Curated annotation (Swiss-Prot):
Acetyl-CoA carboxylase is a heterohexamer composed of biotin carboxyl carrier protein (AccB), biotin carboxylase (AccC) and two subunits each of ACCase subunit alpha (AccA) and ACCase subunit beta (AccD). This is Acetyl-coenzyme A carboxylase carboxyl transferase subunit alpha. Its EC number is 2.1.3.15. Pathway: Lipid metabolism; malonyl-CoA biosynthesis; malonyl-CoA from acetyl-CoA: step 1/1. It catalyses: N(6)-carboxybiotinyl-L-lysyl-[protein] + acetyl-CoA = N(6)-biotinyl-L-lysyl-[protein] + malonyl-CoA. Pfam families: ACCA (PF03255). Keywords: ATP-binding, Cytoplasm, Fatty acid biosynthesis, Fatty acid metabolism, Lipid biosynthesis, Lipid metabolism, Nucleotide-binding, Transferase.
Length: 317
């Protein structure tokens, strides 16, 4: 297990507890009371830390290296029913964007999402979860296929942003994202979107239009990352914590502003602390969202989606 800077008190107590247990096994000394006391202190420390997280700390948790990624959710929720589909039929197969058909609680879905890597080699292979235009065009191809066969769409968002390289711009990055938004608003099947990690800017919006939009508790959704915001406003990344607070990017902020429909609770410590519980909770929210949409006529589905996005935001003097 890797620890973030604010989790170091937890790490110290867990190490103390581990040593206490080892001493108990290797000697005749009764360390049960000591172990219980350390464990009690550990549980209280976890509550004190995780119940009072700052916006920046939630950003850090969303990027935790042990956090489950899109394919982890797909494997856990769909099992062996998932069939991955590849390519945009125009340029190439973008490894930062994955998608395919799978069943969740017996219902077929077309699933699309950004995928990050687990180590240096796979992070480069997945381009750090930053999709190129062909990734967004692949996503749109799969969503249009789902529309053709009447299959609902599930999108899993986890990206630090769309790839900003020159070659991506030359191949039409902005157009690809804009086209996806345009088409998703009009897609004739239910769309459920879940932000499972980072939800940065147009990179997230390119697969982020949904009839139901959920955020996991320790994720963020914003037009810009705190570091980039800090570098623009204060010419330094040192103010990233201040930027995170100002951006109102946490799941609770997004729900208060009615930019997402609900927040999916995570186990204490984050999704990676209890993956099985996280996967089950996410699957339940997917089924719940789909059940709320499945009986709507196509006209009502699209009208409600249009209204949802037309009514977002408010103007204040």
């Amino acid at each position: 297990m890797e620890y973030l800077d604010f989790e170091l008190p937890i790490k110290e107590l867990e190490e103390q507890l581990e040593k206490c247990v080892i001493i108990g096994k290797e000697s005749d000394v009764d360390v049960t009371p000591t172990c219980k006391e350390i464990n009690k202190k550990l549980e209280q420390t976890k509550k004190d830390i995780y119940k009072n997280l700052t916006a920046w700390q939630r950003v850090q948790l969303s990027r935790h290296p042990n956090r489950p990624y899109t394919l982890d959710y797909i494997k856990a929720i769909c099992g062996d029913t998932f069939l991955e589909l590849h390519g945009d039929r125009g340029f190439k197969d973008d490894k930062a964007m994955v998608g395919g058909l799978g069943k969740i609680n017996g219902q077929s879905f077309m699933i699309v999402g950004q995928q990050k890597g687990y180590n240096t080699k796979t992070r480069q292979y997945r381009n750090f979860g930053m999709a190129n235009p062909e990734g967004y065009r692949k996503a749109l191809r799969l969503m249009k296929m789902a529309e053709k066969f009447g299959i609902p769409v599930l999108t899993l968002v986890d990206t630090p942003g769309a790839y900003p390289g020159l070659e991506a711009e030359e191949r039409g990055q902005g157009e690809a994202i804009a086209r996806n938004i345009f088409e998703m608003v009009r897609l004739q099947v239910p769309i459920i979107t879940i932000i499972v990690g980072e939800g940065a800017s147009g990179g997230a919006l390119g697969i982020g239009v949904g009839d139901r939009v959920y955020m996991l508790e320790n994720t963020w959704y914003s037009v810009i990352s705190p570091e980039s915001c800090s570098s623009i406003l204060w010419k330094s990344w040192e103010y990233k914590e201040r930027a995170a607070e100002a951006l109102k990017l946490t799941s609770s902020d997004m729900k208060k502003q009615k930019l997402v429909d609900d927040v999916i609770p995570e186990p204490l410590g984050g999704a990676h602390y209890d993956r099985e519980t996280t996967f089950k909770t996410v699957a339940d929210y997917i089924t719940k969202g789909y059940n709320e949409l499945k009986d709507l006529s196509t006209a009502d589905l699209i009208a409600q989606r249009m209204d949802k996005y037309s009514n977002m935001g408010e103007y204040k003097e």
